[in-house]
Regions:
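A contiguous strand-loop segment
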Residues: 5-76
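Acidic/histidine-rich, surface-exposed loop or edge segments in extracytoplasmic proteins
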Residues: 76-92, 189-193
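Sec-exported extracytoplasmic/periplasmic mature domains
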Residues: 86, 90, 106-114, 213, ...
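Extended substrate/cofactor- or partner-recognition/assembly subdomains adjacent to catalytic sites
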Residues: 93-280
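Exported/periplasmic cell-wall-interacting domains
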Residues: 96-97, 102, 110-115, 139-147, ...
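Intrinsically disordered, low-complexity Ser/Thr-rich linker and spacer segments
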Residues: 270-287, 329-344
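Primarily a LysM-type cell-wall glycan-binding module
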Residues: 278-308, 326, 350
């Protein structure tokens, strides 16, 4: 059912059990939304509709589903774009770069139109949309200057993909996904001025165990294939329990990496303590820390004893072999030893994003050197034309 009531000063509160309650300006509850209900929210306030810490123009449709609550912003394409441009690109960048972003984002949005509940996602899964908070004078000007203009290839809207930075060369679409699009071909990028072009991320053995539990973390990692620009296509990982192969995209998602233009290195840090934990009685830990290479009889290696003081002897060579249940007279089924490796995975990477289509940092550089929005777009999307939108482009 669709709720058809009018309220003023309305506040919506969403509970963890997906229950939605409405409160008036005096904070008095006036209505509960039930499962399968729909609710339309609109306002005459020029500041928009608040959702958490963000404001949105237009209207909001709220849907109560079996497993989720969907909040959909109903807004015209041009108004939507003035927020998208500021969400996707710093508004202090050159106007020609902002205009290129506006045309690419308009094309991308119209290409996605037609989802059963909403047309386009508001995150970087599609393109980022932060509502009125990212709308500025410059973004509105960029959208007005390019009003209705879209990118077409053979009189059809292109899939106008874009990304932050490719680190020198953009990627062919077929080398990242299966589909080949002639206009999404590898071209030179001009993104060397990106201050975050190079990056590095480290993963401890404990983190790797959590990321790859089925194979027991990472003992070895081998890159099986790369693209012409050096992006990882496939890797093989050997863990304590077995091995598995992953695509570069899978690894990027699983490890939350900025891109697939990466290299891996497993290092043994001699200065990093090995850790052995013994869990006793309801997962309460007794933890030992020993520096790799040290003689256990010469150091104090007992820390964080949570239940009992534990006395060990110089004859003990390896804390993982301490017969803790005998010393503390605790049943063996309540004692568990867990050892961790001292290997750390270092991921060194370049660029940010999938690397296909327009590079935003490349667009900025070209704009600072005098390129127009059209020149920027035709560099990154090969063989396209820029035309006012027509229905038959869909």
């Amino acid at each position: 059912r669709f709720l058809n009531k009018k309220f003023k000063g309305l506040t919506l509160k969403i509970e963890k059990n997906r229950k939605i309650m409405f409160f008036d300006k005096n904070k008095q509850k006036i209505y509960d939304l039930k499962n399968k209900d729909k609710f339309l929210v609109k306002t005459s306030d020029s500041r928009g509709i608040w959702v958490g810490q963000k404001r949105y123009a237009g209207k909001l449709n709220i849907f109560i589903g079996d497993n989720n609550i969907s909040v959909v912003n109903i807004i015209g394409v041009e108004n939507y774009l003035s927020s998208v441009v500021g969400s996707e690109m710093p508004t202090k960048w050159p106007m020609e770069a902002l205009e290129a972003q506006a045309i690419a984002s308009r094309t991308y949005a119209l290409k996605q139109k037609g989802n059963s509940v909403f047309d386009i996602d508001s995150t970087n899964k599609n393109q980022v949309y932060n509502g009125l908070e990212s709308r500025t004078f410059k973004t509105k000007k960029a959208v007005r200057a390019t009003r209705s203009l879209v990118l077409v290839y053979k009189n059809k809207l292109i899939n106008a993909l874009f990304h932050s930075s490719s680190a020198g060369m953009t990627e062919n679409s077929q080398d990242v996904w299966k589909n080949k699009f002639p206009y999404l071909s590898s071209v030179k990028d001009f993104d060397k001025n990106n201050p975050k072009l190079k990056w590095q991320k480290r993963f401890s053995s404990e983190e790797l165990q959590k990321l790859f539990p089925s194979i027991g973390g990472i003992k070895q990692i081998e890159i099986l294939s790369i693209t012409n620009t050096g992006r990882v296509k496939n890797v093989k990982i050997q863990g304590d329990y077995g091995s598995a192969q992953f695509s570069g995209l899978d690894i990027r998602k699983k490890m939350n990496l900025k891109s697939t233009l990466v290299r891996f290195k497993l290092i043994k840090e001699d200065d990093k303590p090995n850790t052995t934990s013994t869990t006793v009685l309801e997962d309460k830990p007794i933890t030992y820390l020993v520096k790799a290479g040290d003689n256990l009889s010469d150091i104090a290696y007992r820390y964080n004893v949570s239940l009992y003081e534990l006395v060990t002897f110089n004859s003990i060579k390896d804390p993982t072999l301490i017969n803790i249940n005998q010393i503390l007279l605790i049943p063996r089924n309540q004692v568990k030893n867990v050892s961790s490796s001292d290997k750390t995975l270092v991921v060194s990477g370049y660029g940010s994003g999938h690397g296909v289509g327009m590079s935003q940092w490349g667009a900025k550089y070209m704009a600072t050197k005098g390129a127009t929005a059209e020149e920027i777009l035709k560099h990154f999307y090969k063989g396209v034309k820029i035309k006012p939108f027509k229905r038959y482009f869909l």
